[in-house]
Amino acid sequence: MTAPRTLYDKIWDDHVVHQSEDGTCLLYIDRHLVHEVTSPQAFEGLRMTGRKVRAPEKTIAVPDHNVPTTEGRDTKIDNEESRIQVEALDKNARDFGINYYPVSDIRQGIVHIVGPEQGWTLPGMTVVCGDSHTATHGAFGALAHGIGTSEVEHVLATQTLIQKKSKNMKVEITGSLRPGVTAKDITLSVIGLTGTAGGTGYVIEYCGQAIRELSMEGRMTVCNMAIEGGARAGLIAPDEKTFAYVMGRPHAPKGAAWEAALAYWKTLFTDEGAQFDKVVTIRGEDIAPVVTWGTSPEDVLPITATVPAPEDFTGGKVEAARRSLEYMGLTPGQKLTDIKIDTVFIGSCTNGRIEDLRAAAEILKGKKVAPGMRAMVVPGSGLVRAQAEEEGLAQIFIDAGFEWRLAGCSMCLAMNPDQLSPGERCASTSNRNFEGRQGRNGRTHLVSPGMAAAAAITGHLTDVRDLMMAPAEPA
């Protein structure tokens, strides 16, 4: 009888092609997602050595990082470097015969939203992409993580990856979340507790009642930020919600193949008695709506708190806090709810799905953004955008004073026209608040979609619970 195994153990074991004496493994890769920034050199490497893509049917390409989110982008991209990268992806996808969703295709969007949406991401798979937030796909019980450009070329050429196994970490969220608290608050709270290095060397399995109660969109948000906690990947065991989400999607199995897949997927859970190397437990009812105050995702506090002082920290974190406060232009003791906001960004692979837009629209319905507020919603894919328009969400955003954009990574990172100006302060539903992440000297506060919508209305960081069920302004 075999020893009890974790979910990570099972997926890993099913994909090991060869193991060396030192523990280094050759791992088979089921899905390879590609975007325009980390792939040009990899494809050029294939050309120089006369190699083909080994499994073009398992390789999916989408331009997302560099693409503008305004009309006319399918014919003209002003930034030369961005244009060259998008054109290179277009040529490489066609030359090598891989699956491709160009900007002119309604299915185009952020690669980590397109993969699940199209049924490319399935439970039990290994999924890689030259992108940090590949862990998103772990919400399906897939082993998914980012890889470097040289590894992108290796996977394109061989459909395998050289890896050493990580350790097992369990993050359990017990009980239920309170009203106004979301998946984004879970994942930020975990990072706030463990720090950005807390998951280093581990693959995290998220579990517990609060995780089970999340939708698939919410689970993707949680796994998306596993990398921000230092982990190699984040996983959630598949269940009936997972199967219902996948069923009927364009590239999901059909007929007898579906039944066979389902039988396998139902074995993908951590066995009773399986050992984890590290365990973190948080009570769901203790999690509040949170916001980041500094320049690291671990700089997290409940919205009801005040800006900390450097003296509140120890060791090297004292100087880091001092630098963060200076960069962010904040004063110790200042209420977080007194921090004025210039810009609101709702979107990204963390919070650009239909559920995220619904949550923001619920807060914004019948209201207007604060005077002088710059606010934009960037759906995670063309299909999310179309659905939001069909549901009337787009009109709510437009009526409130938001810009309604085309799909892309947008203001999550300063690689396209959507950027902050120096000193501009943004409430953002994205995943990183590093210095300059959204534009040179821009200031980022990470929040949930509802919290972002609340800040747009009031003009400052706001507890979304104060606006929930609040009456709309008279017409």
UniProtKB/Swiss-Prot annotation:
Question: Which pairs of positions does the record mark as disulfide bonds?
Answer: none
The source's superkingdom equals Bacteria
Q: Under which EC number(s) is this enzyme classified?
A: 4.2.1.33
Cofactor, how bound (note): Binds 1 [4Fe-4S] cluster per subunit.
Q: Give the binding site residues for [4Fe-4S] cluster.
A: 349, 409, 412
Identify the metabolic or biological route this protein is part of. Amino-acid biosynthesis; L-leucine biosynthesis; L-leucine from 3-methyl-2-oxobutanoate: step 2/4
Cofactor(s) recorded in Swiss-Prot or TrEMBL: [4Fe-4S] cluster
What InterPro entries does its record include? 3-IsopropMal_deHydase_lsu, Acnase/IPM_dHydase_lsu_aba_1/3, Acoase/IPM_deHydtase_lsu_aba, Aconitase_4Fe-4S_BS, Aconitase_4Fe-4S_dom, IPM_dehydratase_rel_enz, IPMI_cat
Any idea which GO molecular function terms this record carries?
3-isopropylmalate dehydratase activity; 4 iron, 4 sulfur cluster binding; metal ion binding
UniProt keywords, alphabetically: 4Fe-4S, Amino-acid biosynthesis, Branched-chain amino acid biosynthesis, Iron, Iron-sulfur, Leucine biosynthesis, Lyase, Metal-binding
Give one GO biological process term.
L-leucine biosynthetic process
Q: Which reaction does it catalyse?
A: (2R,3S)-3-isopropylmalate = (2S)-2-isopropylmalate
What functional role does this protein have? Catalyzes the isomerization between 2-isopropylmalate and 3-isopropylmalate, via the formation of 2-isopropylmaleate.
Oligomeric state and interaction partners are given as: Heterodimer of LeuC and LeuD.
Q: Which family does it belong to?
A: Belongs to the aconitase/IPM isomerase family. LeuC type 1 subfamily.
Give the protein name, as stated in the record.
3-isopropylmalate dehydratase large subunit
